[in-house]
């Protein structure tokens, strides 16, 4: 029991590492919480600091979920890797190192799935990148991939007859969509920011 609690705490602390805040302060001298949406996540980093900083934060946030999920495997723990990954997701959303105000945990959730369900991760990655390429909106890409992921997760659960990952992913995906409710409103109004992810420069980055 002590080992399980320790792994969960470690996962939470890993998730609490605010890469967006660190990259903003160390690399650009700004507090990203005071710019854009104010979220400590990949989307706001791309929007405010550009794609180089955004990619760094994306890798960091993705890595948090992946590393946290790997810990139970490396320690041969009885704890399912999914729960360690979920602890990192909670840490990202409510980070102890950033006054409990973080991001929406899309990338961190992706890192968790990379370890716990690689097939589902691949489905999400393809849907995310395809939507991003077409819309240049990270928020819309997150919403679309979460929605497609729910269908994929249920399908995987039916095929494999293992509902642990599909069940918790579905709950997490619905939460991610809920966290994007303000983005959904802006998308409908045509005012949602776009990024220059696939552009050669930052001139079209909001």
Curated annotation (Swiss-Prot):
<feature type="transmembrane region" description="Helical">
    <location>
        <begin position="4"/>
        <end position="24"/>
    </location>
</feature>
<comment type="similarity">
    <text>Belongs to the PlsY family.</text>
</comment>
<keyword id="KW-0808">Transferase</keyword>
<dbReference type="GO" id="GO:0043772">
    <property type="term" value="F:acyl-phosphate glycerol-3-phosphate acyltransferase activity"/>
</dbReference>
<feature type="transmembrane region" description="Helical">
    <location>
        <begin position="158"/>
        <end position="178"/>
    </location>
</feature>
<keyword id="KW-0444">Lipid biosynthesis</keyword>
<dbReference type="GO" id="GO:0005886">
    <property type="term" value="C:plasma membrane"/>
</dbReference>
<keyword id="KW-1133">Transmembrane helix</keyword>
<comment type="subunit">
    <text>Probably interacts with PlsX.</text>
</comment>
<protein>
    <recommendedName>
        <fullName>Glycerol-3-phosphate acyltransferase</fullName>
        <ecNumber>2.3.1.275</ecNumber>
    </recommendedName>
</protein>
<keyword id="KW-0812">Transmembrane</keyword>
<keyword id="KW-0594">Phospholipid biosynthesis</keyword>
<dbReference type="InterPro" id="IPR003811">
    <property type="entry name" value="G3P_acylTferase_PlsY"/>
</dbReference>
<feature type="transmembrane region" description="Helical">
    <location>
        <begin position="78"/>
        <end position="98"/>
    </location>
</feature>
<dbReference type="Pfam" id="PF02660">
    <property type="entry name" value="G3P_acyltransf"/>
</dbReference>
<keyword id="KW-1003">Cell membrane</keyword>
<dbReference type="GO" id="GO:0008654">
    <property type="term" value="P:phospholipid biosynthetic process"/>
</dbReference>
<keyword id="KW-0472">Membrane</keyword>
<feature type="transmembrane region" description="Helical">
    <location>
        <begin position="137"/>
        <end position="157"/>
    </location>
</feature>
<feature type="transmembrane region" description="Helical">
    <location>
        <begin position="55"/>
        <end position="75"/>
    </location>
</feature>
<keyword id="KW-1208">Phospholipid metabolism</keyword>
<comment type="function">
    <text>Catalyzes the transfer of an acyl group from acyl-phosphate (acyl-PO(4)) to glycerol-3-phosphate (G3P) to form lysophosphatidic acid (LPA). This enzyme utilizes acyl-phosphate as fatty acyl donor, but not acyl-CoA or acyl-ACP.</text>
</comment>
<feature type="transmembrane region" description="Helical">
    <location>
        <begin position="112"/>
        <end position="132"/>
    </location>
</feature>
<keyword id="KW-0443">Lipid metabolism</keyword>
<comment type="pathway">
    <text>Lipid metabolism; phospholipid metabolism.</text>
</comment>
């Amino acid at each position: 029991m002590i080992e399980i609690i320790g792994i969960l705490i470690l996962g939470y602390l890993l998730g609490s590492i605010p890469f967006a805040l660190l990259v903003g302060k160390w690399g650009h001298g700004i507090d990203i919480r005071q710019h854009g949406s104010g979220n400590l996540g990949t989307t706001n980093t791309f929007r405010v600091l550009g794609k180089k900083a955004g990619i760094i934060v994306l890798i960091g946030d993705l890595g948090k979920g992946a590393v946290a999920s790997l810990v139970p495997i490396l320690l041969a723990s009885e704890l399912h890797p999914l729960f360690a990954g979920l602890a990192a997701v909670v840490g990202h959303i409510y980070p102890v190192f950033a006054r409990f105000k973080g991001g929406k945990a899309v990338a961190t959730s992706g890192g968790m799935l990379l370890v716990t369900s690689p097939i589902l991760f691949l489905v999400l990655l393809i849907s995310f990148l395809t939507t991003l390429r077409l819309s240049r909106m990270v928020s819309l890409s997150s919403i679309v991939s979460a929605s497609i992921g729910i269908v994929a997760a249920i399908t995987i659960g039916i095929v494999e007859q293992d509902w642990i990952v599909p069940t918790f992913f579905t709950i997490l995906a619905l939460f991610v969509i809920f966290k994007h409710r303000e983005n959904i409103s802006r998308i409908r109004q045509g005012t949602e920011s776009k990024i220059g992810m696939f552009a050669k420069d930052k001139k079209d980055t909001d």
